[in-house]
């Protein structure tokens, strides 16, 4: 490593720890010097100032002209108005009380049966956040059993409904959509609702909406008298919604401490308000990202949690980091193509997979190791073999092997996985994302690429409807002929539509060779 410290001195100088959350952060295996850290001090003055403005209620999502307030959720006292503060406190209290009543059987289905299961319908952060909560924190036989619909793959929907076939009557159906108009959860909800009603079961008394007030979903849930509606404010984005009702309701329904989760995030938020790089964990973490990628994101982030319960954390960070930081333009309107690609799974599994390339292949990444110090109540041994010690040995061995090849890494250590430490860990990465965005002068809170993808998908869906109507005329047509009948279309997406619609479908007569799309002619015969 090119730095002006020897390894031990650098480790001691830059190891961060806080006893409120018992989390350590080590960035010593990132290639930087003291002078480089010092060179960021002026930038960080602007970073700290920008975050203060954001928390005070500045319009930070310029595209949607809205505030960004997920930090208020864990400390309502910093919210810019008493109205918001009271709404947050009331929502937290409502969720906790609702969860208790569900688990105690004080709230039941329309046949007075206790709820046993949850089918959670949500995409992106609306699905990943709850999945992380339940995978990381649910204990055996505690609370309700969760299943997730985070896609409109028909096989996934069929599989989940089959799994719940004899439990549908006692399943809570939670639909999460801020606008209520996002196609995937809306389509999944309609399919599942129809399936439930076809079984002569009552959807409305089992259904919960998490949405923005007066959204399409809000109005539907209110009109149909659903069991419950929880608020998802317009100032909370999907990828930062885990400390809103989106993450707190799952906590309550698996009988975990909602207040401890919020407390962990609030403590970390406070720690990351310290206006000093070395004393601020988010400043250290974002600096490490900045130095490892030369400020232009030239290295990917490989997340390796050494605990199976945190396997989903890699996917969670993938959305949080990539959707926030993957931007074509900076705030000046200059093309910068910023971003950090994130992938990962878990240790020590990945030591038998892609760690080979990380050590000996292209040097285009930095690792984030996540270590835990606790053990189960029942210690598992075989002779003198302790799995915890082996897992720790694998982590340290991989970290050392990478370091010996000048491959960079960050190590985060938690004393245990709890509501408090998970809340703090999530908040640490949220704050680091905000800090990094300020360092490179991009907006972390818009997502023009996602919106462009949604718009393009909507156009294709419209073409699908038009193609279906064209075939109703009974003519035999080629791909080019179909394309010519559609405004502003091109042949390739039309071929994709035709293949999806017609291949293996006896309602259509296909002449031609599927390997030669220009020869294909299609006619609807029934």
From Swiss-Prot:
The active site is at 323 (proton donor), 352, 454. It is an enzyme of class 5 (isomerase). It catalyses: alpha-D-glucose 6-phosphate = beta-D-fructose 6-phosphate. It is found in: Cytoplasm. Signal peptide: none annotated. One of its GO terms (cellular component) is cytosol. GO terms for molecular function: carbohydrate derivative binding; glucose-6-phosphate isomerase activity; monosaccharide binding. Its EC number is 5.3.1.9. Keywords: Cytoplasm, Gluconeogenesis, Glycolysis, Isomerase. GO terms for biological process: gluconeogenesis; glucose 6-phosphate metabolic process; glycolytic process. InterPro entries: G6P_Isomerase (IPR001672), Phosphoglucose_isomerase_CS (IPR018189), SIS_dom_sf (IPR046348), SIS_PGI_1 (IPR035476), SIS_PGI_2 (IPR035482). Catalyzes the reversible isomerization of glucose-6-phosphate to fructose-6-phosphate. Belongs to the GPI family. This is Glucose-6-phosphate isomerase. It comes from Prochlorococcus marinus subsp. pastoris (strain CCMP1986 / NIES-2087 / MED4).
């Amino acid at each position: 490593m090119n730095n002006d410290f020897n390894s031990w001195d650098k480790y001691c100088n830059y190891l961060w720890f806080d006893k409120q959350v018992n989390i350590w952060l080590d960035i010593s295996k990132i290639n930087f010097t003291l002078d480089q850290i010092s060179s960021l001090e002026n930038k960080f003055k602007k970073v700290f100032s920008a975050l203060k403005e954001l928390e005070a209620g500045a319009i930070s999502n310029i595209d949607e002209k809205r505030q960004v307030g997920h930090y208020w959720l864990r400390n309502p006292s910093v919210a810019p108005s008493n109205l918001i503060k009271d709404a947050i406190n009331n929502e937290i209290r409502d969720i906790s009380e609702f969860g208790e009543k569900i688990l105690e059987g004080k709230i039941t289905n329309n046949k007075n049966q206790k709820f046993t299961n949850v089918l959670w319908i949500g995409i992106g952060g609306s699905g990943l956040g709850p999945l992380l909560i339940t995978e990381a924190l649910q204990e055996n036989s505690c609370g309700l059993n969760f299943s997730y619909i985070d896609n409109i793959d028909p096989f996934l929907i069929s599989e989940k409904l089959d799994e719940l076939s004899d439990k549908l009557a006692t399943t809570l159906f939670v639909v999460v959509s801020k606008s209520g108009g996002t196609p995937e959860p809306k389509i999944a909800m309609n399919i599942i609702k129809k399936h439930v009603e076809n079984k002569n079961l009552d959807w409305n008394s089992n259904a919960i909406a998490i949405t923005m007030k007066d959204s399409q979903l809000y109005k539907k849930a209110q009109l149909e008298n659903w069991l419950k509606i929880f608020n998802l404010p317009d100032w909370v984005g999907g990828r930062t919604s885990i400390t809103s009702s989106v993450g707190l309701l799952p906590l309550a329904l698996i009988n975990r401490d909602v207040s401890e989760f919020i407390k962990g995030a609030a403590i970390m938020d406070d720690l990351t308000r310290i206006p000093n790089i070395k004393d601020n964990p988010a400043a250290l973490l974002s600096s490490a990202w900045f130095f490892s990628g030369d400020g232009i994101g030239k290295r990917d982030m490989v997340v390796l949690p050494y605990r199976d319960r945190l396997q989903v954390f890699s996917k969670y960070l993938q959305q949080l980091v990539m959707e926030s930081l993957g931007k074509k333009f900076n705030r000046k309107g200059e093309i910068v193509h910023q971003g950090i690609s994130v992938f990962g799974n878990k240790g020590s599994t990945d030591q038998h997979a892609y760690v080979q390339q990380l050590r000996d292949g292209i040097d285009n990444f930095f690792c984030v190791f996540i270590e835990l110090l606790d053990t189960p109540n029942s210690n598992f041994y075989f002779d003198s073999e302790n799995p915890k010690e082996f897992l720790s040995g694998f982590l340290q061995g991989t970290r050392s092997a990478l370091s010996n090849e000048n491959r960079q890494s960050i190590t985060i250590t938690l004393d245990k996985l709890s509501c408090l430490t998970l809340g703090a860990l999530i908040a640490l990465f949220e704050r680091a994302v905000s800090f990094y965005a300020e360092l490179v002068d991009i907006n972390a809170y818009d997502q023009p690429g996602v919106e462009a993808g949604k718009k393009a998908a909507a156009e294709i869906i419209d073409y699908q409807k038009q193609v279906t109507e064209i075939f109703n005329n009974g003519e035999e047509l080629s791909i080019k002929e179909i394309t010519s009948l559609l405004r502003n279309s091109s042949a390739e997406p039309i071929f994709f539509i035709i293949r999806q619609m017609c291949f293996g479908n006896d309602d259509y007569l296909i002449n031609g060779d599927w390997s030669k799309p220009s020869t294909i002619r299609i006619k609807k015969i029934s």
